[in-house]
Each structure stands twice: as C-alpha cells, then as structure tokens.
C-alpha cells in the first residue's frame, strides 16, 4: 500500500486530541477523587479501582484493535474511542452507586484503548509508514501536557461547580476531541483477510524482547509515578517538587523533537534504558544528599517522557510498517496488564520494604531493562551485518 502525504496540521490536531483524551480519562481521578469521596462517601481506593478496571479492559481489547483499524480506518476508530470517553464522563456525572461508576469505567476503558496513543500511532503508521515517526514525537509532546492542563483546569472547575457538573464539562471536551479526529484521512484496507506473514527466529526474538522490555518499563514507570508523593515526603521535601516530573517529561520530549532524525529509535531506546539505573541510584543517594531527590524526580520524569516515544517508534525498527498495528496490538498486552497491576504492587512493596527498599527493587529491575535494550540493539546490528535489509532509516 502506498503511503499518503502527511498533512501539516495533523501533529497539532492529533496532539490536541491526545491532550484532551488523556486529561479527561487517565488524569481525571487525580483531580476529582477527593471531591467525589466527600460527596459520595466512596473510598479513594474504590474510586481509583475504576481506572484499574479500565486498564484491564484495554489489555483485553488489544488483540482486536488491528482488525478494527483495518476494517473501519483509523479516523473512525479514534473518533469512536473519543466519543466513548466523552460518554463515560457523562455517565460518571450521574453515577450514584459504585456499580454505575465501574460500568462507566468499562466504557472509558474501551474508549481509551481505541483512542489513546497506541491506537492512534498504529493508525498513523498504517497511513504514513516511516513518515509517522516524527509526528508521533510531536503528538507525545502535546499529550504530555495533559496533566499540566487538566489538573489545574479540574481544580478551577471544582471551585465554581460540583464534581458532577465538572464531569459534564469534561464530556464536552470529549466531543471537541472527537471532532479533531476529522483531520485524520479516512482510509480502510480491503476486508479480505490475508494470512499473517510467517515469522522467523529473529522476528520472534524481537517480539519477545520488545514485549518484555516495554512491560518491565511500564511496571517501573507507572509504579514510580503513582507513588512519587510518598518518595518526596519520605525525604522531607515539599510535594510541589513533584512538578519537576512534568517539567522533565515535557523537556525531554521537546529535546527529542529538536534532535530530529539523528536520534534513531534504537539510539533513543539505548539512551533511555541506560539512564534508568543511573537515575534510580541518584534517588537512592537522597538519604545522604537531599538535592539528589529533586534530581531523581526531574531525571525520571524525563525518562518517563521518552519511554512513550520508545514504545511507539521502536516497533518501526523491529517490524515492517504494515505489521505495526497487528504486532503492537498483541505485544503490548503484558505492558497494559502491568500498568493496571503496578500501583497496587508498589503500594504493597512500599509497605513491606519501605519507600527506599522499593527503590532498590526498582533499581534491580532497571538493570534488567538496560540488558534487554542492549540485546535489542545488538540483535539489530547483527541483522544488519548479516545483510538483512533494515526496516527503517
């Protein structure tokens, strides 16, 4: 299939779509949970369990997204997902029982899997092939501002209206987000199913390495970010230091965009993975040097920002573009399960071993992550030396 020309406005419109979708779904409980608890009497864990349920729904749907993209086209899939997130906000606004609350999060989970990064990036790669790589970087730059925009916006809404009314405002934002997907060209593949191409030993190895690598990174990143306030409090710093996380995340993505084609997916993967153990050692040294805690928050925020780009662009180096949606749909399932499990796992770990003990466990996992990154890069180098054509520039 010949790739389409890339519209200039597409990074802006899809970036705004992602900023809204993340802001009104994933980041929503962080703003509204306290107000919901005060009004409904539901516990904070019960409220956040809705988000965990949504993540599990995302994992369950993952294998089917590639077929949906092929049959319906990326524009329709991402638009439907955005509308479902909008609808879920509307249902939550009228929820008076946890059953309704969880039902709304199931709807949100379906919408999130159809319209957040993974589905959008698969749609862009299907349409534009290797051209999509720079657009993906720009979209993550905009999407990374979701918490910066929607946390203060949610707080401001709560000063003038109830959380239920605020969720209805979020639902309207969801409708705007759905309208932005009209900038994505409508394109579908022929509905006749072709058998998946046979996978060789190197291809299977790439798949296992990628799935394990992203799953472990997701586990550490989600667990660390969820319990970041505990770490900051444990070293005696004000919670406002957590703002450095967002600054690091946005700054790193901006620098990646500026670096351009010189920073290939393989180089970015290696740089990100090798920086992780060093960053956690910086955090562990905070028991002796207080300033290093702030350095850890800033540094790991930067790493977390790059991880999203690595997850999206590395498959372009490992697999053919036409296989991107199908392969990532399956290979990202472990990561999505880890995303759902990591907050609870880290809560248990911090209780059992303390915050610093949990940091040591994370540091050990980052060594494994770094080793996997080296294996991926070496595997691609060996493939090139063997004369196998590269899949990307």
Predicted regions and their residues:
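Helix-to-loop junctions at the C-terminal end of transmembrane segments
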Residues: 61-74, 252-265, 350-351
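A late C-terminal transmembrane helix in Major Facilitator Superfamily
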Residues: 147, 318-353
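Symmetry-related core transmembrane helices of the 12-TM Major Facilitator Superfamily/SLC fold
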Residues: 165-183, 358-375
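Extracytoplasmic gate region of multi-pass secondary transporters
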Residues: 29-34, 203-257
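C-terminal transmembrane helical hairpin of 12-TM major facilitator-type secondary transporters
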Residues: 246-248, 263-314
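Conserved MFS/SLC helix-loop-helix module at the cytosolic interface between two early adjacent transmembrane helices
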Residues: 60-98
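Cytoplasmic helix-loop-helix junction between adjacent transmembrane helices
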Residues: 105-141, 320
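Extracytoplasmic
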Residues: 9-44, 61-65, 151, 224-229
